[in-house]
């Protein structure tokens, strides 16, 4: 049986890494020949999770077509967020919870996308559907991904399914949901040792919005001012990315995990889209986005609609 690789998006977050590991566990138990891999560096938050549950990180790959003919995507479907040579392989499965865009295949596939807060909420259901018991460490990974994607069940992306799954998985994993969740988020929000490049690439995604090419990077922080103190350096690096990638807009979002607000730094030729979308005025290239914590639900669709109306 020919091996398939399972991976999440570039600049992987906790859900991307954990979903690849978890789905590989389930598929292997169902008799498939698969390997979880990653398309980028693991974040401090994800490192905390893997260390806590004693799970080895997936292997890093730059390309996939040199290894396999078929791949499985988790936590993404848009081509520009996937492996650089994704066009050279056949996508046979997708498990995701994001919008579907820039995606087509020449062959039929298994495509499962649900409007939930996290990919592992879907994967938990798939264990049950296939009659496979969830191991303690896999429960821990699934729980961690839900905590990460929903900011400990506080994000507007969080659904009743995510809440129910989190409580059940916490019990299987043997952890206190609130205490573990806060420790995990704080580990991810410690940005003191991060370089400017790391801050901008830890959790960054590119999107096509109408005719505009947009990149949105996001970090979680306990004190947003620690990050904003480096605004000059951040803007220099953002402008370099805009020139290199021919971006129309680069938005860097710093989310306060304690107060559930964000500050956005916006650069590029299309910053008026941010002002129009959120009814704000950028002062010194930045604005407070009250109550905004989710890129998926509160930034991407809002900006997409704004660009299409421009």
Curated annotation (Swiss-Prot):
Q: Where does Mn(2+) 1 bind?
A: 9, 13, 75
Task: Supply the InterPro entries for this chain.
Answer: DDH_dom, DHH_sf, DHHA2, DHHA2_dom_sf, Mn-dep_inorganic_PyrPase
Locate the coiled-coil region(s) and give their ranges. none
Task: Indicate the transmembrane segments per the record.
Answer: none
Source domain of life is: Bacteria
Alphabetical UniProt keywords: Cytoplasm, Hydrolase, Manganese, Metal-binding
EC number from the UniProt entry: 3.6.1.1
Enumerate the subcellular locations listed in this protein's record, separating them with semicolons: Cytoplasm
Q: Its principal location?
A: cytoplasm
Q: Which GO terms describe its cellular component?
A: cytoplasm
Q: How is the cofactor bound?
A: Binds 2 manganese ions per subunit.
Recorded catalytic activity of this chain's protein: diphosphate + H2O = 2 phosphate + H(+)
GO MF terms, alphabetically ordered: inorganic diphosphate phosphatase activity; manganese ion binding
Looking up SUPFAM superfamilies in the UniProt record yields: DHH phosphoesterases (SSF64182)
Q: Does the keyword Manganese apply?
A: yes
Signal sequence bounds: none
Q: Which cofactor does it need?
A: Mn(2+)
Q: Report the family membership.
A: Belongs to the PPase class C family.
Task: Report the NCBIfam families cross-referenced here.
Answer: PRK05427.1
Q: HAMAP family, alphabetically?
A: PPase_C
Q: What's the name of the protein?
A: Probable manganese-dependent inorganic pyrophosphatase
Where does this protein come from, organism-wise? Answer: Brevibacillus brevis (strain 47 / JCM 6285 / NBRC 100599)
Q: What is the lineage of its organism?
A: Bacteria, Bacillati, Bacillota, Bacilli, Bacillales
């Amino acid at each position: 049986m020919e091996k398939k690789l399972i991976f999440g998006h570039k600049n992987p977050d906790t859900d991307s890494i954990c979903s690849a590991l978890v789905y590989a566990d389930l598929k292997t138990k169902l008799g498939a020949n698969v390997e979880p891999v990653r398309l980028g560096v693991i974040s401090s938050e994800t490192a905390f999770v893997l260390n806590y549950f004693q799970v080895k990180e997936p292997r890093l790959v730059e390309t996939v077509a040199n290894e396999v003919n078929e791949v499985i995507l988790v936590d993404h479907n848009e081509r520009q967020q996937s492996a650089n040579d994704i066009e050279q392989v056949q996508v046979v499965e997708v498990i995701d919870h994001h919008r579907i865009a820039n995606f087509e295949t020449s062959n039929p596939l298994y495509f499962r996308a649900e409007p939930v807060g996290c990919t592992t909420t879907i994967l938990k259901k798939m264990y049950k559907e296939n009659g496979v018991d969830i191991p303690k460490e896999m429960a821990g990974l699934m729980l961690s991904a839900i905590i990460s994607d929903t900011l400990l069940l506080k994000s507007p992306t969080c659904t009743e399914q995510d809440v129910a799954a989190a409580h059940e998985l916490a019990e299987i994993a043997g952890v206190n949901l609130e205490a573990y969740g806060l420790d995990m988020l704080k580990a991810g929000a410690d940005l003191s040792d991060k370089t400017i490049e790391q801050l901008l690439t830890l959790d960054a995604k590119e999107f096509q919005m109408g005719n505009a090419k947009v990149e949105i990077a996001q970090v979680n922080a306990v004190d947003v001012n620690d990050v904003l103190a480096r605004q000059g350096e951040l803007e220099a690096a953002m402008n370099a990315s805009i020139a290199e990638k021919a971006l129309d807009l680069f938005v860097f979002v710093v989310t306060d995990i304690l107060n559930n607000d964000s500050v956005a730094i916006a650069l590029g030729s299309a910053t008026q889209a941010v002002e129009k979308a959120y009814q704000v005025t950028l002062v010194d290239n930045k604005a407070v986005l009250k109550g905004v914590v989710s890129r998926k639900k509160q930034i991407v669709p809002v900006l997409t609609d704004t660009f299409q109306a421009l």
